Amino acid sequence: DIDGALADENHIVPESAKTACARAQANGHKLFICTGRSVPKIERNILDLGFDGVVSVAGAQANIGDKLLFQHLVSPEAIDAAMAYFAEHHIESYQWQGADGMYISEGYRRHLESKGKTWNRGEFARFWHLLDEIDVPAGSTLGHTIHVSKGSYFTGPEPDVSFEDTQHDLAPWF
């Protein structure tokens, strides 16, 4: 795992971990990252440690080197159903993650910036996309336009709908 295991809260990998990884590989062990993050959210300094593979997006994708072993995508219908649900229930802060990027709502962008996070700069800039700026072809839907393996949402302290209701209402797709 990366967060809180391989790297600290500032995404710094200690020298002891770097040494341990190198020693394990020198002794013939294969090293894999297993993370909830999508690959575009893994910092270059972590990937540069030379892992043999990555299990990412909470197990929805697996790669060995540059070879994709499998990838589970959220169906276009599920994305569209969730987006309609978010709109209906005034859920403004959500994101979708996949191998080609992170797609975020304006509410999620505000959330990141309120935490001092720079979402569209540095090594990750090309992977971040505001959902409102996605060019959805005529006759298509967002669900058919983006390819993602994971989504999440955040509500305020008094949401219009409970987590349990959301879980129940979106159960046909998730």
Residue ranges and their predicted role:
Residues 2:
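Residue immediately C-terminal to the conserved phosphorylatable aspartate in receiver
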Residues 10-117:
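Active-site phosphate-binding/coordination module
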Residues 97-174:
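Conserved acidic, metal-coordinating active-site core of Asp-based
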